[in-house]
Design a protein with these regions (language model features):
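Low-complexity, acidic Ser/Thr/Pro/Gly-rich terminal tails and inter-domain linkers that flank the onset
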Residues: 1-13
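Short, well-ordered beta-strand segments enriched in hydrophobic/aromatic residues
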Residues: 6-8, 17-25
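A contiguous, surface-exposed recognition patch within enzymatic or periplasmic domains that forms
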Residues: 15, 26-162
Length: 162
């Protein structure tokens, strides 16, 4: 079957965790699979997702909904953003929402916390991992209940994936 080996490296004097994985198909025939590596990052009012500048549209898991990005101008996940809403900001996303970008010529996706003046970048070679994705439970009561259920004391979070 499918096998995965993963190594984690912490280097001195660097604020980075390097993760290297190898996937091996032990089946007799080729197999297709999806691979998402996703760090969870702090969400909340000050959170903003940082997608590469060539990501101008996103879609949901099943490609049922498509939106301009980062400024949504239509309906996405049954939310009316027709006034032009920055959906890269956590505070503007009330419902559980995923943003998937199929391709990018850049090697990163990130998060920035305006309240803390800091953030992170998730770096992956775009020739190997061309897609970018974000998942959020949203800031409504429903989303807050899931955040509380799935974290210890850290509150809202966003999943970033490449």
């Amino acid at each position: 079957g499918l096998q995965v080996m993963t190594g984690f490296t912490l280097r001195p004097d660097r604020a980075a965790l390097e993760i290297a994985s190898r996937v091996y198909n032990g089946n007799a025939t080729p197999r297709h699979f999806l691979w998402w590596a996703n760090p969870a990052v702090k969400g909340g009012e000050g959170h903003q997702s940082v997608f590469p500048p060539d990501v101008t549209a996103v879609f949901d898991h099943g490609k049922r909904a498509v939106s301009a990005f980062p400024i949504a101008t239509g309906t996405y996940y049954k939310v009316d953003y027709s006034a032009g809403v920055d959906i890269s900001r956590y505070k503007n996303v009330p419902v559980p929402t995923s943003y998937m970008a199929e391709k990018s010529q850049y090697d990163f996706v990130g998060a920035w916390c305006h309240d803390e003046d800091g953030g992170l970048l998730h770096v992956a070679n775009h020739h190997i991992a061309p897609g970018k994705k974000q998942w959020s439970w949203g800031h409504s009561e429903f989303g807050q209940a899931w955040d509380k259920s799935l974290t210890d004391n850290n509150g809202p979070y966003i999943e970033l994936m490449t």
